[in-house]
């Protein structure tokens, strides 16, 4: 990711994820961006989706979180995503503030409409979520932007990772970083 502060001579790039920690409040989201800047992080990352673009509004076991989940047990996925998403109209103030504070701002798109939307901000890099590693059309569309791509491989098999890398390369991605990650979070304090 040559355009970003990465490389052996530069040390690690610290990316802070806002996710749904804004609790539905733009002022809180902007406060989080300021707090991230105070830590010296290089970048702020958000997620770009709506409940309608990431799941279906149905109430069946396949679309409900299991009862045993500590935080979200028995909730419908649609309701959780509706509550946790970052409204698209917030992207501009979040990205602008992050840039103003000297940080890179980028996002994880979860569908093609999100990529089209993010391109209006000329984001410098995209991250593909672990669970989207099998969404080869999304990976190819991101690759076609010509931007660097961070591909999380935490849930992928070796074959799925190979297919995702091939999709990125076929879309023209020449700046690809594979990110090994855990897809079970928040982390338990003992694991931190």
Predicted regions and their residues:
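Catalytic cores and adjacent flexible loops of soluble metabolic enzymes
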Residues: 1-192
């Amino acid at each position: 990711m040559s355009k970003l502060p990465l490389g052996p001579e530069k040390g690690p790039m610290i990316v802070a994820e806002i996710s749904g920690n804004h609790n539905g409040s733009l002022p809180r989201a902007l406060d989080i961006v300021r707090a991230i800047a105070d830590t010296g992080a290089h970048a702020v990352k958000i997620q770009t989706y709506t409940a309608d673009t990431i799941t279906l509004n149905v109430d069946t076991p396949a679309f409900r979180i299991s009862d045993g989940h500590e935080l979200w047990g028995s909730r419908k996925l649609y309701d959780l995503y509706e509550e946790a998403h970052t409204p698209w109209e917030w992207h501009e103030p979040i990205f602008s503030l992050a840039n103003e504070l000297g940080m890179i701002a980028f996002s994880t798109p979860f569908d093609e409409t999100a990529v089209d939307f993010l391109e209006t901000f000329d984001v410098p890099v995209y991250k593909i979520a672990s669970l989207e590693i099998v969404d080869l059309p999304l990976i190819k569309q991101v690759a076609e932007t010509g931007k660097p791509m961070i591909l999380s491989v935490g849930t992928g098999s070796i074959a799925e990772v190979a297919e995702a890398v091939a999709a990125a390369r076929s879309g023209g991605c020449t700046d690809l970083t594979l990110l090994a990650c855990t897809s079970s979070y928040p982390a338990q304090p003992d694991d931190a």
